[in-house]
A protein has these predicted regions:
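Conserved "HGTGT" condensation-loop signature of ketosynthase/thiolase-family condensing enzymes
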Residues: 1-79, 93-97, 104-201, 208, ...
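Active-site histidine-anchored catalytic micro-motif
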Residues: 86
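Active-site ligand-binding patch in enzyme domains
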Residues: 211
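Internal catalytic or translocation cores that form aromatic/hydrophobic pockets or channels
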Residues: 329
Length: 382
């Protein structure tokens, strides 16, 4: 079964806050749900499908009850930061098969305000965490290996932050709005060699939500039509053989699956929302998705190709996780939201991509250097 053209994004909402000390996580989920419903012109009584991940307090049953929903389909797939891209694909499958007709997907949390639970579980706790396999260290290891294999430099990685900051200056809700230079990035404190502080994403409270529905319903609503035409997902772990190669991610599998279903190529894409937990995350995904050859990512970004109005592939025009928002340490939701804004023509005029009719939203979840998931969505303006 193909989901091509079967599901439309009728509502989007990104919470404007980046710091919410006086709100509960459940309240944030309710606020983003309300915002997406208002964007679509619907009410909660219209929802018959609900999707959430590990950030939802009490899980899917508790959230359905708290939000006052009556659903006939639900999904709580948990794959870290790319969960919401996975949910979009799964919602499209549910809609295509008649399991539901209007799905709500929510993300919310407070990592900036409240304590985060320990990340390591299972095999990680027993065999990896004790040896210093923290998030920053693992991504630093990936960056170092990429440099060793392909000659990538810290200055090239810095161009990704520069592009993100160029876009963030136009986003009134971005956490960091100051435009930075390559020198600024290289002069920021070292966090995990070779990654500097400015190579790392922000930590923010907040969240976001999506409304996904059928073509018939979407055409009856108020927003410009945007549909999902391709989706792919994959998991990569460290067990055996080539899986130990730190220079590629599960995007090498999820990307081609999404492009094949959509019937398009990387060269057709007008705008890219690329997961940016760290600058190295972006570089690896650009290569793995086919926007440049493996090993050429450094030159691709240093040529300014990610800057809207200048480059070949404008990316993360809201400022992304590097500058604007990385709610709950999970950036997949905001990647979809900004892609939809671009396709609707609702991005900030200074960063709006002209005639944007085809976009990609891609994310990862987990740790690139150990085990992680990837999910790729190809979106089209109708």
């Amino acid at each position: 079964m193909t989901i091509k053209g079967k599901a439309y994004l009728a509502g989007i909402y990104e919470h404007p806050t980046r710091h919410a000390p006086d709100k509960s996580t459940a309240q944030l989920h309710a606020e983003v749900a309300k915002g997406a419903l208002e964007d679509a012109g619907l009410t909660k009584a219209d929802i018959d499908g609900y999707f959430c991940a590990g950030d939802a307090p009490g899980g899917v049953m508790a959230m359905v009850d708290y939000l006052g929903l009556k659903v006939r389909h639900f999904d709580s797939t948990e794959t870290g930061g790319c969960s919401y891209l996975v949910h979009l694909g799964h919602a499209a499958e549910a809609i295509a098969s008649g399991k539901c007709s209007i799905a709500l997907i929510t993300l919310a949390g407070k990592p900036r305000t409240g304590a985060m639970p320990p990340r390591a579980t299972g095999a990680e706790l027993d065999f990896e965490a004790a040896y210093g396999a923290t998030t920053h260290n693992v991504y630093g290891m990936c960056a170092m290996r990429h440099m060793h294999e392909f000659g990538t430099t810290s200055a090239q990685l810095a161009w990704i932050k520069v592009a993100a900051s160029h876009h963030a200056q136009y986003n009134p809700h971005a956490m960091l709005r100051e435009v930075v230079t390559v020198e600024d990035v290289l002069n920021s404190p070292m966090i995990s060699d070779p990654l500097h502080r400015m190579d790392c994403c922000v930590v923010t409270d907040g969240g976001g939500a999506l409304i996904v529905t059928t073509e018939t319903i979407a055409r009856s609503l108020k927003q410009p039509l945007v549909r999902l035409i391709g989706h792919g997902e994959a998991i990569k772990g460290p067990r055996g053989g080539k899986a130990l190669d730190l220079t590629y991610s599960a995007g090498v599998w999820s990307g081609p699956r999404a492009f094949e279903e959509a019937g398009v190529t990387p060269g057709d894409i007008k705008y890219a929302s690329i997961y940016d937990s760290f600058t190295i995350t972006v570089l690896m995904q650009l290569e793995d998705l086919g926007f440049c050859k493996k090993g050429d990512g450094g030159k691709f970004v240093a040529d300014g190709n990610l800057i809207s109005g200048v480059g070949k592939l404008p990316f993360n025009t809201d400022g992304g996780g590097l500058c604007s928002n990385h709610p709950v340490n999970r950036g997949g939701m905001t990647k979809i939201i900004e892609a939809v804004r671009q396709l609707r023509g609702q991005a900030h005029p200074k960063v709006q991509v002209p005639n944007c009719d085809l976009a990609i939203a891609h994310g990862t979840g987990g740790l690139l250097g150990i085990r992680h998931a990837a999910s790729t969505c190809i979106l089209e303006r109708v």
